[in-house]
Amino acid sequence: MKRPDYRTLQALDAVIRERGFERAAQKLCITQSAVSQRIKQLENLFGQPLLVRTVPPRPTEQGQKLLALLHQVELLEEQWLGNEQGTDTPLLLSLAVNADSLATWLLPALHPVLADLPIRLNIQVEDETRTQEQLRRGEVVGAVSIQPQPLPSCLIDKLGALDYLFVASPEFATRHFPNGVTRSALLKAPAVAFDHLDDMHQAFLQQNFELSPGSVPCHIVNSSEAFVQLAKQGSTCCMIPHLQIDQELKNGELIDLTPGLCQRRMLYWHRFAPESRTMKKVTDALLKLGRQMLRQDDIN
């Protein structure tokens, strides 16, 4: 059985996390040449490349498996050894979450964990359709995802749903939809997407108004909070979680353009198994507040 030296795995992990050899060397307090040597040693052990040397570097499939192994071992070491090794370094937890969860319920959910445990979060923001891939690649130890099936050797729990409403300011609605929300008006109304892969707005219009994907002009803005600001100032119409704009809907700053219609995204919490004590506390905190704040109609 091939047993890697964990110093070599930590070098591989550092190159991925720091997005390059130079910063990885600084992080590990060794030379860049030493980082390269450790990774080469690991690649020689397994007889195959473990890094795709692009900018930034990314792990191969075998590299992903080794990173996942490293992260699981680190969590289990924390569980069984605790701080017996005399280090005051907080445990690093890398989590992949969608921007809308981060802007609404996730940080309040993690508050008691951060207050109680010596951990350091590395939150990586990604669309909920793609966060599970980061877990698969070993880049994170937990992910909020819409995928209902767990990866091999992973655990999953249903959190609840975010309901997205199609909203705009009253002034925007008067200007762009004087005769109501129609197909012809939608083709001219400015909208916004999180990135070029964000298809929620287009999917909603296709499902409810039979508009083909790509037919509506969209700004690209990588910020959940900016969606709210753009809508409130009358610049765009957009899909925003009801949870995020409850107050704006109540005070009239925003209006629901299509009452009775919404785009629902059921969210799941994925993480590696077995679960360490620290990850169990993270899981319990996310499930507790997530199930209080997210829609639960479809929870079995």
Swiss-Prot record:
SUPFAM superfamilies (alphabetical): Periplasmic binding protein-like II, Winged helix' DNA-binding domain
TM segment ranges: none
InterPro entries assigned to the protein according to its UniProt record, in alphabetical order: ArgP, ArgP_gammaproteobact, LTTR, LysR_subst-bd, Tscrpt_reg_HTH_LysR, WH-like_DNA-bd_sf, WH_DNA-bd_sf
Keywords linked to the UniProt accession: DNA-binding, Transcription, Transcription regulation
A GO molecular-function descriptor: DNA binding
Gene3D superfamilies: 3.40.190.290, Winged helix-like DNA-binding domain superfamily/Winged helix DNA-binding domain
Residues in the DNA-binding region annotation: 21-40
Ranges where the HTH lysR-type domain occurs: 4-60
Disulfide bonds: none
Family matches, as Pfam families: HTH_1, LysR_substrate
Protein role: Controls the transcription of genes involved in arginine and lysine metabolism.
Subunit structure: Homodimer.
Family: Belongs to the LysR transcriptional regulatory family.
HAMAP family, per the entry: HTH_type_ArgP
Protein name: HTH-type transcriptional regulator ArgP
Species in which this protein is naturally found: Photorhabdus laumondii subsp. laumondii (strain DSM 15139 / CIP 105565 / TT01)
Lineage summary: Bacteria, Pseudomonadati, Pseudomonadota, Gammaproteobacteria, Enterobacterales
Name of the encoding gene: argP
